[in-house]
């Protein structure tokens, strides 16, 4: 891992603006501080300029020549960040931060941790580092599971699980075996502990900064005290959603698969 920098949303927005991408910068700033008037925005940017100077990111020589007043390596970093065409996004419901991994070029990727929509930390990594980066980010328990557990749901039942009050309806439209009912109860207990929300790892393709990113793949999962529940889509005709309690080893295999899929975009 090759650390790049840590900055605030305002600092990142100014760096992106100076690099010629005001539209992208606007989105970064508004995600942190909300919509502002032009006068308020100018005041924020003036203060932020002083912060960039203090951090020695500002290049007076470049400014005196009428060029972008940023060090060359910072300009290269911003260009890679804004123009990245592939991104892995790792949600973390239990924390106030999120991990994103942007593809830069060839086997070079960049981790991007956003803390409370305010602090941004960046580092360059290799594609082969992606599985371990994600594994360490989540740091799920390595305790072994007591027994195999799984159940199947229809697409409708899976969608209904986003709301606690739909449990009875999910049971009504599902045909659980006694073993699946027991697994479903265990899953619901873990879902309750996680605020009734699943985690996910998503792969996005962003062919143009003028367009919204395209979701290419997504995996849903949920940590348990022992093991990790993983959602998998199958070719079952009526209940294609399979929810299975994975061992930590299976979780690591899944992340290796994420790494392999990421490596395929290098070519």
Residue map of PLM features:
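Generic structural signal for hydrophobic core residues of well-folded globular domains
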Residues: 19, 55-56, 81, 258
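Non-catalytic recognition/regulatory regions in large multidomain proteins
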Residues: 2-5, 28-30, 64-267
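Short, amphipathic alpha-helical interface elements at domain boundaries
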Residues: 1-53, 59-73
């Amino acid at each position: 891992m090759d650390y790049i920098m840590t900055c605030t949303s305002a600092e990142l927005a100014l760096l992106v603006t100076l690099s010629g991408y005001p539209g992208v910068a606007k989105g970064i700033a508004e995600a942190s501080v909300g919509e502002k008037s032009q006068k308020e925005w100018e005041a924020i940017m003036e203060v932020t300029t002083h912060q960039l100077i203090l951090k020695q990111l500002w290049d007076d020589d470049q400014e005196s020549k009428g060029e972008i007043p940023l060090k060359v390596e910072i300009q290269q970093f911003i260009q890679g960040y804004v123009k990245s065409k592939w991104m892995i996004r790792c949600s973390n419901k239990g924390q106030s931060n999120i991990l994103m991994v942007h593809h830069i070029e060839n086997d070079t990727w960049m981790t991007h941790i956003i803390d409370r929509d305010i602090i941004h930390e960046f580092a360059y990594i290799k594609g082969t580092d992606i599985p371990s980066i994600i594994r360490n980010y989540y740091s799920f328990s390595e305790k072994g599971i007591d027994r195999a557990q799984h159940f199947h749901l229809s697409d409708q039942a899976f969608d209904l699980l986003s709301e606690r009050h739909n449990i009875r309806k999910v049971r009504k439209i599902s045909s659980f075996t006694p073993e699946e009912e027991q697994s479903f109860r265990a899953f619901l207990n873990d879902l309750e502990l996680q605020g009734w929300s699943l985690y996910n790892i998503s792969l996005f393709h962003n062919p143009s900064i003028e367009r919204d990113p395209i979701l290419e793949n997504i995996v849903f999962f949920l940590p348990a005290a022992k093991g990790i529940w993983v959602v998998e889509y199958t070719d079952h005709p009526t209940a294609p959603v399979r929810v299975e309690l994975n061992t930590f080893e299976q979780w690591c295999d899944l992340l290796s698969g994420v790494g392999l899929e990421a490596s395929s975009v290098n070519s």
